[in-house]
Amino acid sequence: HTLDPVTREERRRCFWSLLLLKRLHGAEIGILDVTGEDNLPWYPKSAETPTRIDDDVTIELGDGGKNRQGILAIAIQLSEIWLKITQYARRRGKPSSLPPWSPQSEYATIMAQQMESETRMPKIHRFKPAQFSKQSTKDLHTRRDYWGPWIFAQFIYHTNICLLNHPLLLSLRLRNFQSQIPEIFLQSTSDLISSHASWITHLIGMFEAKMYKVTDPFLGHCAAIVATIYLQESFVDDLAIREEKMGNFAQCLGFVRGFVEWPHIGRLVSDPGGERQYSDYL
């Protein structure tokens, strides 16, 4: 029988909530698995984009209009890549016959999907056009229905790249190719980590400046992953670099501590220094 619009939307939200939860836990889809995207229900309705403060940033007319994907759809699509990356990371100890720089490798396939997702993101949801930093604290809290998913999408996008290129996980993957690793590949992964890890600390700084309280524990999980990168990078002889990396680590750790009411995060930060848990986090 035909469902009324309210019931149909509730069922969509229920389905995608369960699927999103399983993806974020890195779990196999199981009973929720379906064959092909055509069999999936349409994405749930997203909140309208907040009023823009000014017109410094031009949004192209060809950005989708009424058919533009909402912020919830963007977040859900990025969660699919997160699932693939976490499963890839869990197989870090298993040797592969293909090096990650091979176009046919799992690494290259996931990286291509991540880049493809960026081409589908409407410009209005991207960092600069969204104008988060220009919104008042009151407006940010009033429009959490939009900014919550937007922040989630920002965090998972950058953390996807950080986890895929994590220096510790990558070193385990490269053990079988020590004599033939292209220098350009190592430089590329280093640049990606540097850029996208800094975006996480930049976002954390924005929350602090706007006094915007975030409550999603997944964001703490993302910050913890980035913290492990900064911690590993701090073990250098150069004092200036060491202090910079430890400062970034401390910023991530402070953010993670804002989620201690969640047991798994509480255990993570229970050590006064935090270093031991973070070094074992992955």
Residue ranges and their predicted role:
Residues 1-69, 82-105, 115-145, 165-184, ...:
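Acidic, Ser/Thr-rich, low-complexity intrinsically disordered regions in fungal proteins
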Residues 15, 75, 152-154, 193, ...:
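Residues that mark the junctions of alpha-helical repeat units in TPR/alpha-solenoid scaffolds
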Residues 19, 74, 156-158, 223, ...:
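TPR repeat positional signature
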Residues 82, 224-227:
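Eukaryotic multi-pass alpha-helical transmembrane domains
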Residues 153-163:
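C-terminal substrate/ligand-recognition segments
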Residues 163-165, 230:
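Residue at a conserved register position within TPR or TPR-like alpha-solenoid repeats
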Residues 211-221:
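All-alpha amphipathic helical-bundle segments outside canonical DNA-binding/catalytic cores
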